[in-house]
């Protein structure tokens, strides 16, 4: 999962990861946290191909409105997307097992602390893309004051506690070519960690220390384990009957 300010290079990094995954016999699938939000916007006639400002304003307003009703609303929608992917894959495999390839799910818009927590729940690798000293497009635009930018801006201005919620931080402050070289140098390491389910080894918090004994030995089972973790999380979130 990739975090960072708007237009810092998150989607670009997601595209490069997808290319690497495809070239290494994985099936890459980009599933943004905002996928369900964008679908709702499209139903109302708002897309990136229409008025960009109106599209952004609608998405930010709808996103905030639903989070006010339930802070985890979009996280739950994301989990539903992953479950649907898994169910579709299982149906396809029953018809033709030869089509199987390990999936790599890439999320290019991790913007809130509860989204990082959701990433940890499914043992996802998390990367923060920092602008460093580079000035971003529309640096002082009003839309950058929206709550969806707050986490990334806090990290950029020195909030170490939030930055430490991510496994990696990469600076995109030079040319795109330089950033690509920096990212590509990490891909082998990232995919090894994912395949071996060793992400807990990057963190020394009490939770990760205690869970190291439960790593998956079989990388082929990672997608199935993600589903099990999501289901367990949903079961734990349900209110208990009295």
Regions found by a protein language model. Give the residues of each.
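Hydrophobic positions on the alpha1 helix immediately C-terminal to the Walker A/P-loop
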Residues: 13
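Hydrophobic anchor at the beta1->P-loop junction of P-loop NTPases
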Residues: 2
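Amphipathic alpha-helical oligomerization segments
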Residues: 194-213, 218, 236
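Small-molecule kinase domains that catalyze NTP-dependent phosphoryl transfer to phosphate-bearing small molecules
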Residues: 113-116, 120-122, 128-198
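Conserved lysine of the Walker
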Residues: 10
């Amino acid at each position: 999962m990739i975090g960072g300010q708007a237009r810092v290079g998150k989607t670009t990094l997601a595209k490069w990861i997808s290319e690497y995954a495809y070239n290494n016999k994985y099936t890459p699938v980009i599933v943004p946290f905002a996928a369900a939000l964008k679908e709702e916007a499209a139903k109302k006639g708002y897309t990136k191909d229409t008025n960009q400002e109106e599209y952004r304003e609608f998405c930010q307003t709808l996103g905030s409105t639903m989070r006010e009703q339930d802070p985890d609303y979009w996280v739950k929608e994301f989990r539903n997307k992953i479950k649907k992917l898994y169910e579709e894959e299982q149906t396809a495999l029953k018809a033709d097992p030869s089509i199987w390839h390990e999936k790599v799910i890439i999320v290019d818009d991790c913007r809130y602390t509860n989204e990082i927590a959701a990433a940890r729940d499914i043992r996802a690798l998390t990367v923060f893309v920092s602008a460093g000293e580079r000035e971003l497009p529309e640096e002082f635009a009003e839309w950058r004051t929206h709550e969806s930018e707050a986490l990334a801006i806090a990290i950029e201005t020195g909030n170490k506690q939030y930055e430490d919620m991510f496994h990696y931080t990469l600076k995109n402050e030079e040319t795109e070519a330089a950033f690509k070289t920096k990212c590509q140098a990490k891909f082998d390491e990232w995919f090894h960690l994912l395949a071996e389910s060793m992400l807990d080894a990057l963190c020394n918090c009490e939770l990760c220390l205690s869970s190291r004994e439960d790593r998956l030995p079989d990388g082929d089972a990672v997608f199935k384990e993600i589903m099990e973790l999501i289901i367990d999380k949903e079961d734990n979130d349900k209110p208990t009957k009295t």
